[in-house]
């Protein structure tokens, strides 16, 4: 991919920033989710930091998860800077990746479609059937905005933030 982008845009730093920021955002989100569960305290809802939520709740954030998100973003930023030789990318991509991850949490806590499994008595993203095989009931959010679209939006938001930081928009 490095060579294909370089062929079409050899001296355009914004292309590299956008590409790396999309990867940084989704990596940051993955690290936040996977490592955030290690936080000793329960997460808080991103839209109301006084509201305690269960681990794994869409829109829930924690200190460990947020730091993991920053680390995941910084790793991609470091690799992008190393591969391009342009160390000014590091801060832009790190910030954009973290912002994308937080945007993912914001969407998850506000408008992402969430469902309820009457058998397990749990909130879930699964629809029409929960993993136990029970039909889920819509609780909140826009029914068309599933977790896949939220994840895609995370990457796009990272790109937009990187371009804003570079002054492209």
Question: What positions do the PLM features span?
Answer:
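Hydrophobic alpha-helical transmembrane segments
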Residues: 1-169
């Amino acid at each position: 991919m490095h060579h294909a982008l370089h062929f079409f845009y050899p001296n355009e730093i914004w292309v590299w920033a956008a590409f790396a920021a999309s990867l940084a955002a989704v990596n940051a989100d993955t690290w936040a989710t996977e490592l955030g569960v290690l936080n000793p305290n329960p997460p808080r809802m991103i839209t109301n930091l006084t509201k305690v939520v269960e681990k794994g709740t869409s829109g829930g954030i924690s200190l460990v998860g947020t730091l993991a998100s920053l680390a995941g973003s910084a790793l991609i930023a470091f690799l992008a800077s190393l591969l391009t030789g342009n160390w000014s990318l590091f801060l832009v991509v790190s910030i954009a990746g973290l912002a994308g991850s937080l945007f993912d949490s914001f969407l998850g806590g506000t408008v992402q479609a969430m469902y309820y499994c009457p058998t397990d008595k749990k909130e879930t993203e699964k629809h029409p059937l929960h993993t136990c095989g029970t039909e889920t009931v819509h609780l909140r959010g826009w029914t068309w905005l599933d977790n896949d679209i939220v994840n895609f939006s995370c990457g796009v938001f990272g790109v937009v933030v990187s371009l804003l930081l570079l002054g492209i928009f």
